[in-house]
Amino acid sequence: MKKSLKKILAFTMAAAMAAGLAACGSSASTSPSAGGSGSAPTVSDEPIKISMYYADNPTLPYMDSWLAVQETAKIAGVDLTVEAIPSTDYNTKVSLALNTGENCPDVILYQDTKGENSSLALNGAIVPISDYPEWTPNFNAMVEKLGLKDDVEELALKDGKRYFMPQLFDQPFYDGGLIMRQDYLEEKGFDAPKTFDDLYEILKAYKADHPDSYPLTTLVAPYVTYRMMMPSFGISFGKSSSSGTGALSYDYEKGEYFEGCISEEAREYLRFMNKLYAEGLLDPEMAAPIDGDVWSTKMATGAAMATYAYYDQIGGVETASEIDGFKLQMYPSLEGPAGAHHQPKSKTGKGIMFPASTAERDDFEQVVRAVDEMFFSEECSTIWCLGVEGTTYTMDGDKIVYSDDLTSSPDGIYKTMQVKYGCGADPFQFVWINEREMSKYDENYAQINKTVAGMEDGNVIQPLPPTPLFDDLTAEDAASLQTPLADSIEVWIDAFVTGSKSLDTDWDAYVAEMKNLQIEEFCKMYNDNLRK
C-alpha cells in the first residue's frame, strides 16, 4: 500500500510539473538561483481554495476572524478553510490522514519528519517540497537572510529530500518555564528557586499554609510540564519528547541516543514527580486536555501557586486574581542532576507539509506558491508577528510603537496580540526574529532571557536531537516499533507518577515490557542511522 503511494506520488508530481510548465513556459524548468527566485505562473483573479489542518491550543483557540489570518490570506490570494484540531489529538489525526490518504487537507501545519512521519515521507505520503525550490522563493530568501541554509539542509532525509517547510528562528529564546507566586516567595522570605529541592520546599510550605491547595498545577496537559523539566534530569521522553519518538533520549556528550524512558535518569525524575503527587503538591487533575480557563482560575485563586507555562500568560492570570499583591514571575531553568536545562530547541521548528493528495491538484504549483507567500514573504511574516501597520503598530524610525489597545491591555502586548489578532500563534508564525519578538515583552522578560543565556555556558536550551537518515524500509520498521512503545510509556508514566505502580517493585516489569516491545532494537536503529 505504501509502496504504491510512492509510485502514485512520482506520477502526480510529474503531472503537476508538466502542468506548471505549460502555465509558466519553458523558463520554469530552469534551475532556480541561490535566492530561489522563479517566474510566477499565470494565476486566476479568483482566490485559490486551500484547506489546512491547524493544531488548536485551548489557551489560544483559533478564530477565523483573526486579523493576521485575514490579511495574509488576502495578500496571498487564498480562500482558506482551517480545520482546528485540539492539540492533544493533533498528531493522531495527522497520522490517520497521512496513513490512509483519505480526507487529507491540502496543507498540514506544525509537523516535522521525526518518528512516523519519516516513514510516511519516504513511502510517498508527503510531497518532497525540496524538489520545488522555484516554487518557494520567499522561503528560500528567508533562509538566506537568517543564515539558516545548513540548518535547513540538516532536515533532509536519507533520500536527500526535505519534506516540510520549517519554522525559522534567528536564535532560540526562553519563552516559557517555571512560573510561581513571587508575592508568596517574598512574604515567606524564599529566594528565587535554583534547584528542584528549592521548588519542593516552596511547594511544601505553600501546602502547609493552604491545605486545600495543590501547589503545582499543569497547563493543557502533563507533557508541557514534563518537556520543560525532564532535560534537567538528562532525559526527554513521553508524548512531547524532543526526539519525537516518545521512548528515546539523546546523550549530548556522547552524541548518541539511549533508552531514556527506562534509564535511571527517568526513574529519578518519576520518583520526584511521584513524591510531589503523594504529598499533595502536584495537581491530580492531569487528564488532557486541561481547559485553559480552569488552569488560569486555579492560579488566580490560589488553588495553585506554581506551574510550567509561558511568560505571555502571566498578565492574564494576574489581572484575573483578586488576591491582594498577587504577582507572578517566571524563573530560569532549575538545576537537576544533569544541570539546568530547558526543552531543546533549534533554529528550525515544526512546519508545513503537503500531503501527496495535494500534488494531484491541477493547480498544485499555485497552492505551494500561495502558501510560500502567506507564511514566508517579508510582508506576511511581519504581519504574523506584528500585525498590520497602522492598526496594531506604527513605526517611529526604527522603533516599533504598539497601539494603545495593546499597551494598555492587562494581558500584555504579546498575549493580547495572540488572542485578539492571531499574531504569534505558534502553528501559524513561521519566521521568528528575536529582536522583533522581544519588542512585545517587558524588560523583566528580556532580563530573564539574558540570565538564561549566561547559564550552562549558554547551553540551557540544547539543540533538538539529530534526525536519523532512515531509508524507507528502516523508517517503516522504526515507525512500527515506535507506536506501541509510545502508547505503553504513556500508561506507565501516569501509573508511576500517581503511585498506582511502584518505582521500586514494578520498575523491572516496566523495563521488561519495554524490552519486549524491542526498545533496544529501536534505539540501535536510531544510532546506526545518524548522520556521520
Predicted regions, residues:
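Extracytoplasmic/secretory soluble proteins
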Residues: F11-M13, M17-K532
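Bacterial N-terminal signal peptides that target proteins for export
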Residues: M1-F11
